[in-house]
Amino acid sequence: MATCIWLRSCGARRLGSTFPGCRLRPRAGGLVPASGPAPGPAQLRCYAGGLAGLSAALLRTDSFVGGRWLPAAATFPVQDPASGAALGMVADCGVREARAAVRAAYEAFCRWREVSAKERSSLLRKWYNLMIQNKDDLARIITAESGKPLKEAHGEILYSAFFLEWFSEEARRVYGDIIYTPAKDRRALVLKQPXGVAAVITPWNFPSAMITRKVGAALAAGCTVVVKPAEDTPFSALALAELASQAGIPSGVYNVIPCSRKNAKEVGEAICTDPLVSKISFTGSTTTGKILLHHAANSVKRVSMELGGLAPFIVFDSANVDQAVAGAMASKFRNTGQTCVCSNQFLVQRGIHDAFVKAFAEAMKKNLRVGNGFEEGTTQGPLINEKAVEKVEKQVNDAVSKGATVVTGGKRHQLGKNFFEPTLLCNVTQDMLCTHEETFGPLAPVIKFDTEEEAIAIANAADVGLAGYFYSQDPAQIWRVAEQLEVGMVGVNEGLISSVECPFGGVKQSGLGREGSKYGIDEYLELKYVCYGGL
């Protein structure tokens, strides 16, 4: 069984001086925080202190396949992004484990698809109830492995659980059709049937919600799943597995195979090319999505892709400045700018530009506090790793070298290598990296524009189209712009648009299909036409 590296006999000696703040001790079935405060500067302590008192059953480190917790031949470390300290060692699954998980899921599918919609609904509801009962522990796991501020982590757990609740209800609403044909002696039926085993590959920025948004729909439809969570945040996926087991979800219906970054490519390829897999659902970068699409093409598998974005945030002269700033703060700085629907470029009309920039800068200075995600008052945690920080830093330096002005922020934060100051740039032009590369960090570049047509042209120039936002008090303009923006989701005078009841997805290279809402379950259902003759 994989254990916390701090207390593995050889690991403690090797890593003790490198990660002095991590003080977890192993207990059968998971990791348990050691007693006593973690040493070191308060702002850089390992998140182990925030895990004190956590249910040992939720801190799993092995893979979950066929209803059993299984070790792998190797393990990999999961790190606290705030300090770099290791939280624990997790099973590093390879191709062999991936194929075993697919087979377990396929065997379970042969039984699960026969389970009544009412029973599937009941089991999903039990899973939801367990998430709500354990919401505090689940939130702390998210903060520990991703750095997300605890308040936001609590919000994610509720959002995550609501997908299970929603799809528990949708499970009983999978209806077919009866079609009357021109021939009097025939009747046509349209059945909706589960597609089969779904390979689910999820990101680190929402390590719980991105799983339940996919898995809730899949299980409601009668599919089974193999989840490959992001290597940075496997603990959330494994905690969900424990709760699924407690809820009575049958063995093999929900499987989790964590793996290291080194093994991620081959494991992803293995589950996406396995002939027993019928469906692939992926949330992540457009680059990786294209690779998975290539794998799916060889066997023509059904695919759902939620990929990168370059969300424009447009502020027209008629906008209410205070409302626009509030929306900008919510859209840009949630999860320290690490969301796929995060505003990436701010297009502000000339007449309101100066007032907006001034108010935006003041709001950032007043309301944003960088720190450890477990500390009360923190609104901006660390970025997931130093590579993410380097990307933000590169974009800022590129913009400044080409004439942009730093209004506030602009550099790494003194707290540590994975922290970056919330940054506002003005005098930004379209030749700068930050206007055509997804940042995934706390950088807000402002471009000044003159006409509505100019703003639409800039926004639609991107080859991706996930989300877009704009602020206006002109009713005619609102209709025009909402219809003309080439994105899958539009926020009109609103910076937070995600909801379990509404379809989530993009156009162009931002993906295929929709998740959540009444449409989400259709991604896991096949239509079958049955013709009855001789009547």
UniProtKB/Swiss-Prot annotation:
Molecular function terms from GO: identical protein binding; succinate-semialdehyde dehydrogenase (NAD+) activity
Phosphoserine: modified positions: S499
Binding positions for NAD(+) per the UniProt entry: R213, K228, P229, A230, E231, G284, S285, T286, T287, T288, G289
UniProt keyword annotation of GTP-binding present: no
Pfam families membership: Aldedh (PF00171)
Catalytic reactions of this protein: succinate semialdehyde + NAD(+) + H2O = succinate + NADH + 2 H(+)
Known function: Catalyzes one step in the degradation of the inhibitory neurotransmitter gamma-aminobutyric acid (GABA).
Name the record gives this protein: Succinate-semialdehyde dehydrogenase, mitochondrial
Annotated organism of origin: Pan troglodytes
